[in-house]
């Protein structure tokens, strides 16, 4: 086991070393390469083309094929920009580089501050909108003149480990680039144990909640015109521990800039069922997707249980 772990660490080190020269380039140079990557994904590799087109067509049955095709193209461009932004982010060992680029801004940090002050802990339900690979810099995205509780030692991000251990190590270290000496990531399989054992401590938990659920699921109802099951584990924990629950939306409002907005789902999750919390989350997510359709991860097999 130790030998395999060492092999993965070496592989991850090689990948990150190859990324390093590109990571130090100015962000605007990365967007120059993004155009080529988008073309490569769409026109040459046809990356998950069937999944993307099928998801879009079923989610927007009233739209024309021309609209589906354009939105798919916009998504490929967005995906390419996410890739180059993640590479650039790996070079942000100096948080000032993040703040100077102002690539992400918190629109209403006062809402999460209020929730944090008035709740045992806060459960923030995230999505696959925007660029979640930039969330390792959340501590540095508040440009408003108000207090924000998103700080190292307070924020704990729940993530799902990749099957490929080398790439899992690459992304794990990448997300920690601005704060490499700080811990704060929880693997999804250990979420229940960690939160239960730290229930007397005040934390903010960030959970990406819109993937296809393999366990702890419920029937959400109709989401994007399709019957959908949703992951309910985070909502169940929040309900049992009487946590405040927020939705976190991330919008790519222009190239090189994302806005993060929090919306209150409930102040005390014990007053709602986990199913009600999850339904409200999906209502907010659907609203965001309809406003900026290309901004979601259409290449994900979200409805793999539907024939």
Question: Which role fits each region the language model picked out?
Answer:
Residues 2-131, 170-174:
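Membrane-anchoring hydrophobic helices of lipid-metabolizing enzymes
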């Amino acid at each position: 086991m130790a030998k395999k772990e060492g092999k993965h660490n070496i592989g991850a080190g090689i990948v990150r070393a190859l990324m390093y020269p590109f990571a130090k380039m100015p962000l605007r140079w990365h967007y120059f390469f993004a155009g080529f990557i988008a073309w490569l994904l769409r026109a040459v590799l046809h990356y998950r083309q069937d999944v993307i087109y099928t998801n879009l067509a079923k989610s927007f049955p009233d739209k024309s094929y021309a609209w589906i095709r354009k939105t798919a193209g916009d998504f490929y461009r967005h995906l390419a920009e996410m890739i180059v932004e993640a590479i650039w982010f790996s070079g942000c060992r100096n948080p000032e580089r993040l703040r100077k680029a102002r690539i992400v801004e918190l629109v209403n940090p006062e809402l999460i501050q209020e929730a944090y002050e008035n709740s045992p802990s806060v459960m923030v339900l995230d999505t696959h909108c925007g660029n979640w690979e930039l969330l390792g810099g959340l501590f540095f995205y508040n440009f408003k003149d108000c207090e924000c509780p998103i700080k190292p030692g307070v924020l704990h991000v729940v993530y799902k480990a990749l099957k490929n251990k080398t790439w899992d190590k690459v992304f794990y270290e990448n997300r920690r680039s601005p704060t490499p000496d700080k811990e704060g990531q929880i693997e999804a399989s250990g979420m229940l144990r960690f939160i239960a054992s730290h229930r007397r401590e005040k934390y903010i938990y960030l959970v990406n909640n819109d993937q296809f659920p393999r366990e702890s699921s419920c029937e959400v109802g109709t989401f994007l015109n399709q019957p959908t099951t949703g992951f309910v584990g985070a909502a169940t924990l929040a309900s049992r521990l009487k946590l405040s629950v927020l939705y976190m939306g991330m919008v790519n409002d222009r190239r090189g800039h994302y806005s993060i907005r929090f919306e209150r789902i409930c102040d005390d999750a014990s007053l709602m069922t986990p199913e009600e919390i999850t339904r409200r989350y999906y209502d907010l997510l659907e609203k965001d997707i309809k406003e900026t359709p290309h901004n979601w991860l259409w290449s994900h097999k979200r409805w793999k249980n539907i024939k």
